[in-house]
Structures are given as structure tokens and as C-alpha cells.
């Protein structure tokens, strides 16, 4: 029997959420940027020998949709919070905007996967902003208590499959109480470090 999993993808405008989903579901990279309002994709996968159907919800990151976006949150099994590895601003908004929005609109907060996008551009001098390192990403994961931190590229597909496999895995095999306790402990420990790295 196939397990249906609702995956909600959120993050700032232009961090590559739609490209991420199109690349994963169609194995192709979109040629031009098209701002998303709301869109849905579906993908079948097998995680630990269990067939799953991922219902992937693409959301608009712009402020004009702030009041409408959370209407799609009920029933979400796992959130993917995206930021661009070449945008410090989008990274900061993980803890300033996206994590608080999830907390405020969900009675029970489902697992969260934190994802750094545009891996192929990091270190290429393509951004005027400070780039985000793997260490900074892990600190942010701890600060918000996310289940996993991953980095990927929609263009090269490096790390792409891992993102969605982890999303399916955390729903199929929820963390134990011990793992959750450790995550919360890491969260408290990482909170100061993460805020320090954000304001550097």
C-alpha cells in the first residue's frame, strides 16, 4: 500500500523552490523564472522499501501572500524550509519569518527539513551577499529544531533526491523520544551560535 505524504515547501522568493520541485519531479530544469502563487506536484518514491507518494506543495514567498499561504498548511506531514546558499538574507529569514510562521499556524508542528539551495553557485562569486557555509546551516538546523539539514542544486541535481528521501523517511519513521530530546537539546545549544552566525 502506498503511503501518501503531504510536503509543504516554503522559503523566500527566488530561492529556487519551484526549480527544486520541477527538477525533482520532471528531471528537467526550467529555463526561466516564473513566480509561484500556489502549485502542486506529485512524485512516487521508495524509502526503506516502502512505496510513498509525495504530494509536493509549492508556495509563494512574497509578502503579499502572507495571509493566504498558511491556509494550505493544515494536514502537512513535513515542512521543507528553503533558503539560498548565496543569500544571507534568505538564510536569516528562516528563523525570522518561516519557522515562526509554521509555529504560529500549526497546532502540532510536523517535522522540518532545512534545505540550502543553489549549491552549484556557492563559491563562484555570483552573489554580493555573504554565502552560507555548511556549518552555518547545521547551526540553523539546531536553532529551529529541524530534523535534517541538506544542501542541493536543482540545476545539477546534486543532493536533490536526498532532500525528498529524508522528507519521506521522517514521516515513515518518526524520531524516537530520545532523538527528539537530543534535537531539542541541540536546538537550545545551537540557538546562540546560530544567532551569532546570522548577525556576523
UniProtKB/Swiss-Prot annotation:
It is a lipid-anchor. GO terms for biological process: actin filament organization; cortical cytoskeleton organization; defense response to bacterium; defense response to Gram-negative bacterium; endosomal lumen acidification; establishment or maintenance of cell polarity; exocytosis; mitotic cytokinesis. The keyword Nucleotide-binding applies. A lipid is attached at residue 197 (S-geranylgeranyl cysteine). CDD domains: Rho. Residues 178-200 are annotated as: Disordered. The modification Cysteine methyl ester is found at residue 197. The keyword Transferase does not apply. Residues 198-200 form a propeptide. GO terms for molecular function: GTP binding; GTPase activity; protein kinase binding. A motif (Effector region) lies at residues 33-41. Keywords: Cell membrane, GTP-binding, Lipoprotein, Membrane, Methylation, Nucleotide-binding, Prenylation. GTP binds at residues 11-18, 58-62, 117-120. One of its GO terms (cellular component) is nuclear envelope. It is found in: Cell membrane. PANTHER family: RHO FAMILY GTPASE. Belongs to the small GTPase superfamily. Rho family. This is Rho-related protein racH.
